[in-house]
């Protein structure tokens, strides 16, 4: 944005380096609570790649103007709807599930239906580890602690930590919402397998939140799934998450998030039009359907114990058989059982990546897995202490001002 084009009595553009969502949101928070020409009561945080209607701002202002004192310190959490299916609400308040995944407190709401509109505005009991996504989140200034600002994670997890660590409570209202692209049909292994898991471990260690959740167990489960689907790059990303967490918090002291993102994005499988990687016809409608005839208990045992035949001689495999599977979370071991190769398909844009068995890569990943997990278990307490000790610095106003090249706070 050109500041000269937008700066006015009511708008001020603050140029910022690419320091990710965490850096941008923290800059906005600090500028808002430090402004001398007006006294902000709330700070509204929003993603820059969403579609929003003026009605959301009108309703937010009206809600805050009418709110009773006992609710005045609650976050106003705007809902996220799918840009690709604009009637579907994904989430207004999310929470960290017991298995370490993240998702909505409510079911998916079809907001063109009257019953969903009514249900969506009913009182609900929020889970203990609930959070407001920063695609649209309005935070009371009195709930912002200058000594506990966001964790400098670049992207993913900063909003979760801020809500949970600050024991946030929430207000939601139909019509306070945005539409976001990409959530409905785009899987990014770099973000979902590396960034989310690395940051989950960091915010848990740094702030002591989500104590009962075993994120390592979740990572181990994904590693087993991905290596059996011949997704060697995905396994690399999972191990990168643990390895870089174990290296400690020093990487967060300087703005290098963009460089880290690019280096790990290079490990994403390069999806190409199906016809360029596979000559036979593909039934895209069946990609997200499980096979009617599932594996027998004996077949499941062989699948798991041999990591889908990777510990066996090649003559055990189904020769000339290419399994067509989903490229994302969806998993049906029956499809890829002892397949010679696997075609990971995105039916949304008809692209695919052909995975081929590589026993050398398989062995390297298994050895790395053992090494990384052993190091984590042996050093977990010391690693967590490093993050706890760094929290006071990394979340302080003085750190963030230096990080963002802002002037020192006026005393």
Short names for language-model regions:
Residues 107-136:
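A recurrent flexible, glycine/aromatic-enriched loop bordering the glycosyltransferase active site
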Residues 180-198:
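Nucleotide-sugar-dependent glycosyltransferase catalytic core
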């Amino acid at each position: 944005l050109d500041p000269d084009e937008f700066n006015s009595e009511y708008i001020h553009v603050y140029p910022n380096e690419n320091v990710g969502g965490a850096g941008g949101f923290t800059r906005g928070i600090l500028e808002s609570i430090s402004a001398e020409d007006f006294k902000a009561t709330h700070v509204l945080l929003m993603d820059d790649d969403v579609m929003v209607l003026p009605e959301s701002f009108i309703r937010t202002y009206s809600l805050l103007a009418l709110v009773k004192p006992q609710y005045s310190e609650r976050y106003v959490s705007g809902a996220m709807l799918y840009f690709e299916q604009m009637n579907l609400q994904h989430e207004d308040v999310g929470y960290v599930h017991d298995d370490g995944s993240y998702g909505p407190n409510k079911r998916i709401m079809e907001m063109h239906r009257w019953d969903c509109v009514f249900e969506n505005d009913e009182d609900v009991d929020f889970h203990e580890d609930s959070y407001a996504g920063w695609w649209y989140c309005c935070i009371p200034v009195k709930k912002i602690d200058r000594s506990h600002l966001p964790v400098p994670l670049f992207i993913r997890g900063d909003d979760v930590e801020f809500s949970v660590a600050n024991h946030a409570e929430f207000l939601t209202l139909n019509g306070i919402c945005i539409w976001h692209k990409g959530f409905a049909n785009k899987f990014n292994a770099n973000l979902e397998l590396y960034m989310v898991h690395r940051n989950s471990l960091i915010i848990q260690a740094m702030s002591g939140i989500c104590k009962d959740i075993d994120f390592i167990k979740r990572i181990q489960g994904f590693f087993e799934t991905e290596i059996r689907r011949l997704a060697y790059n995905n396994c690399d990303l999972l191990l990168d998450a643990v390895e870089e967490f174990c290296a400690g918090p020093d990487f967060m002291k300087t703005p290098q998030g963009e460089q880290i993102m690019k280096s790990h994005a290079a490990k994403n499988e390069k999806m190409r039009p199906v016809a360029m990687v596979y000559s036979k016809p593909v039934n895209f409608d069946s990609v997200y359907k499980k096979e009617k005839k599932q594996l027998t208990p004996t077949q499941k045992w062989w699948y798991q114990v041999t990591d889908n035949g990777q510990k066996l001689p090649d003559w055990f495999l189904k020769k000339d058989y290419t399994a067509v599977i989903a490229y994302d979370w969806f998993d049906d071991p029956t499809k890829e059982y002892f397949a010679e190769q696997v075609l990971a398909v995105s039916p949304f844009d008809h692209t695919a990546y052909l995975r081929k068995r590589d026993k050398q890569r398989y062995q390297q990943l298994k050895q790395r897995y053992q090494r990384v997990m052993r190091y984590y278990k042996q050093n977990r307490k010391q690693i967590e202490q490093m993050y706890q000790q760094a929290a006071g610095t990394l979340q302080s106003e003085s750190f963030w001002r230096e990080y963002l090249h802002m002037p020192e706070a006026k005393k």
